[in-house]
Every structure is written in structure tokens, then in C-alpha cells.
């Protein structure tokens, strides 16, 4: 396990830096960000991704089911700005705004969809929070990529550094995690991620079914966040590989999608 997974303030600042350098500039290509912009992040954690948006004057809202993350987010943001709201709840039980004015211009869903069991219902609920002219940014690791199972959260050096182990059959994967003396909570989380695995093909079927339109997408060979984590230079997957279904998942460390409502 890397230090950033235990030092939450460090993790917060890492996300802030990546968001400022990559997410804001990418989103700004498709949606002008102003002091009137309403930005929502679902599964916000401590809210690091939202910092650059708040610094631009956007009104930001973060939702997370983990109370400890929301408590930290409120503490961290108290040092930065006042135009931020954080809510601890199960997003599926959070009521959507009725009026378009109360909905959001930008919604962030980063490293979240791969944890969600009922993805279709989740995306449909998310859709009800998006303004008719808004955009949804979704980022997730393709399931079959070397660390698509999030095994980097393991404490064991073997499990946290060994690629593709999440692709083992369930019984073998579970046994390996136990053999490496991973905590029950970690094993449970990793097996849940395996159950909820998200490939590019699955995600594209889901957004089509939920009637989202793809405005833009990027398949990264070297995830932009790896610049902050590992000092690696971000790199897109060669375009011809984008078109090779199934095989592309093994090389895509991060998938980015800009979506809007199909009727806009």
C-alpha cells in the first residue's frame, strides 16, 4: 500500500493537483466554468477533485457515503473556500432537484462506477441531477488493465505490486489475498470490485441504454494521475487500439468520457 492511501491529506492534495492540471482543462473544452457554474461530484471522498473548481468560483457539492471522508472534506475545505457543500448519504437515496436551475452544469464521477453494483439504475438517477445543457465526466480504470482490481490498496507488497492478479478465478484470488494476510475488510472490498467490474464495452452499453450521448472520450495508456503518483508522463493509447474491442481493456489504465443528455 502506498503512503497516499493512509495519509489522506496527501491523497487530497494529489487529487487536487491532477484535477487542476487535467480535469478542469478537459472539461472547460466542453463547458464554460464560471462563478455561476454548479459542480457536483458523486463519490467525492475528501473532495480533492473539487478544489480547482471551487477556486474558479464554481459552487461545488460533494456526496459520499463514508462519513469519515465527508468530515475530512469539510475540514480541508474550511481552509480553502466557503462555496462548498458536502453531504454524507447513499446517493441512490438522495433526492434529485425538481427545477433545471437547481441541477448541475457539471457532474464528476471519477473512480466510482467500478464500485457500483446496479450501474444502470445509478446512471439513471445521476441523469436526473444534470442540467439539460450540462455535462457528465466519467473516469474509470478498464477492468482488465494491470491494476483494474484496485489491488494497490493491499498492504502486502506482492498483492499491491503484482499486475493482473484480480483476473484470477474468485477462489484463487480470495485464497491469495488470505495467504498474503490481507485484512478481511480489504478482501471484501476487492472481491466486491471484482463482482462490479467495469469494462469499456459494458460501460458503453450502459450509457446507450440510459440515453446519454458521448461528446468525447479518451483512453489513457498512462493515466494522467500517474504523473502525480509516479512522476510518469501521461500518454493516450494509440488510436488504432481504441477500436480493438476487449483487447483495449488490457492497456487502458483510465477511460474518460464526456457525456450529455441525448435530447440536447
Tell what function each PLM region has.
Residues 93, 114, 145:
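Active-site micro-motifs of SAM-dependent methyltransferase domains
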Residues 57, 81-83, 133, 211-214:
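A generic structural signal for alpha->beta connector loops
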Residues 51, 72, 118-119, 147-149:
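Short glycine-/acidic-enriched loop or helix-start segments at secondary-structure transitions
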Residues 120-125, 135-260:
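S-adenosyl-L-methionine-dependent methyltransferase catalytic module, highlighting the catalytic core
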Residues 116-117, 130-131:
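Helix-to-beta-strand junctions that scaffold the AdoMet/dcAdoMet cofactor pocket
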Amino acid at each position: 500500500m502506498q503512503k497516499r492511501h493512509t495519509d489522506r491529506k496527501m491523497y487530497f492534495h494529489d487529487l487536487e493537483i491532477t484535477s487542476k492540471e487535467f480535469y478542469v482543462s478537459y472539461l472547460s473544452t466542453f463547458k464554460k466554468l464560471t462563478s455561476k457554474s454548479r459542480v457536483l461530484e458523486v463519490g467525492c471522498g475528501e473532495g480533492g477533485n473539487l478544489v480547482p473548481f471551487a477556486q474558479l468560483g464554481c459552487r461545488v457539492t460533494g456526496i459520499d457515503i463514508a462519513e469519515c471522508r465527508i468530515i475530512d472534506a469539510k475540514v480541508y475545505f474550511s481552509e480553502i473556500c466557503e462555496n462548498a457543500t458536502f453531504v454524507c448519504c447513499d446517493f441512490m437515496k438522495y433526492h434529485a432537484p425538481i427545477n433545471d436551475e437547481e441541477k448541475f452544469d457539471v457532474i464528476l464521477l471519477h473512480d466510482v462506477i467500478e464500485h457500483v453494483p446496479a450501474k444502470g439504475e445509478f446512471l439513471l438517477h445521476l441523469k436526473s441531477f444534470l442540467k439539460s445543457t450540462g455535462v457528465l465526466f466519467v473516469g474509470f480504470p478498464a477492468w482488465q488493465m494491470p491494476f483494474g482490481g484496485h489491488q494497490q490498496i493491499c498492504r502486502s507488497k506482492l498483492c499491491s505490486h503484482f499486475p493482473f492478479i484480480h483476473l484470477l478465478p474468485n477462489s484463487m484470488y480470495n485464497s491469495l489475498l488470505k495467504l498474503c494476510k490481507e485484512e478481511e475488510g480489504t478482501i471484501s472490498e476487492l472481491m466486491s470490485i471484482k463482482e462490479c467490474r467495469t469494462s469499456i464495452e459494458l460501460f458503453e452499453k450502459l450509457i446507450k441504454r440510459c440515453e446519454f450521448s458521448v461528446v468525447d472520450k479518451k483512453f489513457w495508456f498512462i493515466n494522467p494521475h500517474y504523473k502525480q503518483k509516479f512522476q510518469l508522463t501521461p500518454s493516450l493509447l494509440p488510436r488504432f487500439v481504441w477500436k480493438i474491442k476487449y483487447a483495449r481493456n488490457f492497456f487502458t489504465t483510465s477511460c474518460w468520457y464526456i457525456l450529455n443528455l441525448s435530447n440536447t
